[in-house]
Amino acid sequence: MAVPKRRVSHTRSAKRRTHYKITLKKPVKDSDGSWKMPHMVNPNTGEYKN
């Protein structure tokens, strides 16, 4: 079992966590020309696009 040899300080762990950022998905253009978020159904046409 993996056990840390030394305690990791709060500052050090916080610095490491700064790189775990949430990336926002960019909108895509649907077949009818409207912009929507990916992996969602278009309410106008009912189409699903990645």
Swiss-Prot record:
Keywords: Ribonucleoprotein, Ribosomal protein
Chain intervals with Basic residues compositional bias: 1-26
Origin superkingdom: Bacteria
Chain segments carrying region Disordered: 1-50
Spans traversing the lipid bilayer: none
UniProt-listed InterPro entries: Ribosomal_bL32, Ribosomal_bL32_bact, Ribosomal_zn-bd
Gene Ontology cellular-component terms listed: large ribosomal subunit
GO terms of molecular function: structural constituent of ribosome
SUPFAM superfamilies documented for this protein: Zn-binding ribosomal proteins
GO biological process: translation
Family: Belongs to the bacterial ribosomal protein bL32 family.
NCBIfam families given in the database record: rpmF_bact (TIGR01031)
Protein name (database record): Large ribosomal subunit protein bL32
Organism: Aliarcobacter butzleri (strain RM4018) (Arcobacter butzleri)
Gene that encodes the chain: rpmF
